[in-house]
Each structure stands twice: as C-alpha cells, then as structure tokens.
Amino acid sequence: AIPSTYRSQISMGLPSEIKPEDITILGGLNFEKGKIALKTENYTENDAVKALLKKQMESFGKTNGTFVKYFPASTLMFINMGVKGDGLYNLLSENKEFRSTVSIAKADEVKELFNSFNGDISAGLINVTMNSAPTFLAYADVKNGNALEALYKNKQSLGMRKGEDIMELGKDEYVYKTRGMNIFFGIKDKQMYATNDELLYKSIGKTVDKSIKDAPYAADMKGKTVFMAINAEAILDLPVVKMLVGFGGKEFKTYSDLASKVSYLSVSSEGETSETD
C-alpha cells in the first residue's frame, strides 16, 4: 500500500474517481554504449484513468523543434513540448487546484492565453550566478497577440503588489517590472517570448552560432511530445559551481566527480511511453 503521506502528494490534481494504485507503470532498463536508458509505459484497466490519459494525449502534439536555434548549446536545462492550447486548458480546467487558483474574474483572460498556444513551447535556464536571479528564456508558437494585449489592458485586475507594474515598450512588447527583476515579454512573428535578461530580450528572434541543434541530445528530441534535458557538463562549468567545489570540501568534490561522468540527463514522452537517459 502507498503510505498516506505520499498518497496525498501523488493524488494532488487527480479527479476523485482516480486512485494512484489504479495506474501501473511498466519499465525496462537498457544499458547501451555510453548510455543508460529507462523506458516506462502506463497501464490501467480503470476507465476514468484511460479517459484522463486520452485527454492528456490530445493536449499535446509532436514537437517541430521550432525554437532550438535560439538557445545556446550550453543551456543548463531545456524543456520542449508540443502544445494544443485549447485542449490543455480544458484538461487543466478539470483540475481542482487550477480552478481554485484562477478566479472567475481572470478565467476568460487565462483561457484566451492558453487557447493562443498552437505548437512548440520551449524554455531554457541559460545561466546561474551569485549576484542575480537565474537567467531564463522562453518561446511559444501562438495564433496571435490578442491575449497579451488583453492582459496589459486589464493589468489593474491582476492584483499586482506595490512596486510591480506592466509597461508597454512598443507594439506587442511589454515588461513586467518588480523590485527584484524585470521580465520582458511579447510577440514577434507569431512567436511569444519571455526572458528576464535585457541582452537576450534585445536579441529575440536571432539564431545563435552554436545552438541546441548541435547539442548531443538534439537527435533524441525528434518526434517527442515532451522533452527535457539537463546539461551536466555546462552546469559543472559554471563559475559558481566551480567555487562551491573549490571551497565546499570533500563532499562537494565527490559529487562533482560523480557528475563529471555524465554528459547530460534527458527525460522525454511520446504518447503513453516515457524515456529517461
């Protein structure tokens, strides 16, 4: 039996008629040259679970790799997924936690934002330092910029705190200002973007010389609905990590030596099958 502590965590967000024990995960571990792969697949005889899994599959589609050219190969963590916005919103709207978070006043705006998604969504953790918030970059295929325009026009209803504001920088260009950081976001050529780095904002839509297309895991992304990669080599090369290893004693050195044996870790999903490499 699943301990009650873990049961509540696993069950969070699931419909009441679905219990974790109704879902069986079948897996196999393969050892290949220079690679360890864990493949898993969901199995159930519960009709409610089957219906939920079907809705999940209908909310995602195969990725096209539209945005990989904008992310450097040194990206620390990269997530890529193919999204059908209207299906995803319908799926989330059945989630009790989601409904309690999104108020009735904001429901239409949130629905329009989700419905605008139509294709790839890519996000990456670009850099981590001791002096500022981690740098991120995100892109999404969208139908139009109506959702962001509506968000800006109705910003007074968003319940922003003192010191927070959304300012218009130009047509379909905005910045969300807080005391801690600025988040630049907007629409360019039917591509939504967001970043908290001004230099990245100024180069939105420009390809980088050595991109994720050249990363060792690039070929593994093809045909997947969801893909995530953690670049162990790039993380170990961060100045902040090198400093921790240098001053952290034997324990940090041991972890660093273990991590140095790994090039990258990837997790992907294609239909009901998931793979971890």
Describe the predicted segments one by one:
Residues 1, 115-224:
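Single conserved position on a long alpha-helix in the C-terminal lobe of the eukaryotic protein kinase
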Residues 1-82, 88-90, 220-277:
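Leucine-rich, highly hydrophobic segment in Treponema pallidum outer-membrane-associated proteins
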Residues 24-28, 64-68, 109-113, 120-128, ...:
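Generic recognition of flexible, low-complexity loop/linker segments
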Residues 42-44, 83, 127, 144, ...:
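A mature extracytoplasmic/lumenal domain signature
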Residues 93-94:
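Juxtamembrane segments of multi-pass membrane proteins
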Residues 99-114, 225-237:
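Extended amphipathic, helix-rich lipid-handling scaffolds
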Residues 105-109, 177, 213, 272:
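Non-transmembrane, amphipathic alpha-helical segments
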Residues 105-110, 188-206, 249-265:
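Extended, charge-rich low-complexity interaction segments
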